[in-house]
Amino acid sequence: MRVTGLGHASALIETRYGRILTDPWVNPAYFGSWFPFPDNSGLDWDTIGQAEYLYVSHLHRDHFDPEHLAKHISKDTRVLLPAYATTELRDRLEDLGFRHFVETVSDEVHELDGGLQVMVQALTSPTDGPIGDSSLWVSDGQHTVLNQNDARPGALDVFQQLGPVDAYLIQFSGAIWYPMVYELPTRAKQALGEPKRDRQFDRTLRYIDECDARFVFPTAGPPCFLDPDLWEFNDFGDDPGNIFPDQSVFLAWLAEQGHDEGRLLLPGSVSDLALTGAPVTHAIDPASVFGANKPVYLKAMQERRQPEVEAAKATWAHPEIELLPALQEWFHPLLAESTRMAAGINGGIRIVAHDTDRGDIDLLVDFVAREVRLYDGEKVRYEWRTQRAYLEQLVHEHEIDWVNSLFLSCRFSAKRIGPYNEFVYTFFKCLSEERLNYAEGWYEEQDAAVAAETIELDGWEIQRRCPHLKADLTRFGNVDDGKLTCTMHGWKWDLASGRCLTSVGKDIRAARLGEPVPVGAPAEHPAVDTPDERGQHDDEVD
């Protein structure tokens, strides 16, 4: 079995029974902000696209590239389809001309032609990807690959039951807008970015230790930013708070932790798992893209590819769209159906759309009155600003996932009072009736099924499953001075009160050893009016 790197989360897994192409992404994503690093546009995609199988893990645009899929990937390929709660991924692929699908069942092994075995684990909470993220396990009877990309399973036990893993592909770098877009002083952003970066590495190491694979291939990041407006987000090694460290930085850190199984995959790199040590042959000299040469490399890449962004920018403004009535028509039915999310937000979100020539539009999405109206000085906890053209483009395309478009573009600024609120994030990725109803139902089920199982941790008895996304706290829980941190995403709780310090509506059941643990969910606590303790949702949400 051979694994060929194709850039970011994309790889070609070559087995004796056929080839699987994963997450091919080439074109700029998220309002032209993200590009694969290093540049993979020069690969022979027409040949690569003849693979027998295609796996698109989820609908994030750095994994799902519709333009590239339509142009370069054979429509005769068989698509390995995760078992998501909605049909959006299949619908999008069918719109591109794909017709042959392998409908997988999450956590079940499927045997394909000739004996090739695959298993796709689908994660389906509202905060997993755009209503879904997934991992792919592949075995040809001789070697095994686990491609986790940027999925965050609570544990890897389902995969471990299938035997040792030879190659483990896993995300390690940031994929989010936090803390860069927040309206804070530079030093404050650096202070928030450093623990975020540390958590990314620590979380990845926990997965690596749990998987215990023969070889580890850090993938699925980081992107690079070629637009001059976003250039500062690239990591050139001079900012310890930068959340986008590259593969060379992570592999050096991994070696410092005593791990020698790390392997570097660049676009065109090939690792043969059948050879001793799984040596990697590179098509690109790593020294030419990392370290001191990285700024030079990115400047040259910017010269080649920034025209793609400029061409896209020219299409975003839609002066014919009247934003207020358009958003009222779109949002009002959703707000009327939103129960859990509206209660969780319990206030207004201010949205300011700037335009120097045409004038600004200042809007309020009111989750109490369930309406969109012009902002009139109301006190709000949550506020974000962007360009009017970007908001018009979202309306023009009827983009139902603003997280997977504008927010990940980092082409906005934000501020808030108090802690991160998961319901704000979830609402803006659920701007369709189907998505919103799914998310509302998911929250309803979680509240109704509070787990009774508890664990003992550093003098406390605590519910075993994290209230956020059900991570096993025996693996991911750390207690320090009465504060619990779930290192899966960095969420924090005050154990004495059970109060979540990171978001609202996610309290925990806990008591000191020897005292009774609350049977139901703790009483709700009022929202915090002061800045949180920066147990920031690690992925707001990456």
Mark where each language-model region is.
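Metallo-beta-lactamase
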Residues: 82-143, 245, 252, 261-265, ...
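Rieske [2Fe-2S] iron-sulfur-binding domain
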Residues: 65-68, 445-525, 529, 537-542
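Zn-dependent metallo-beta-lactamase
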Residues: 1-42, 433-455, 540-541
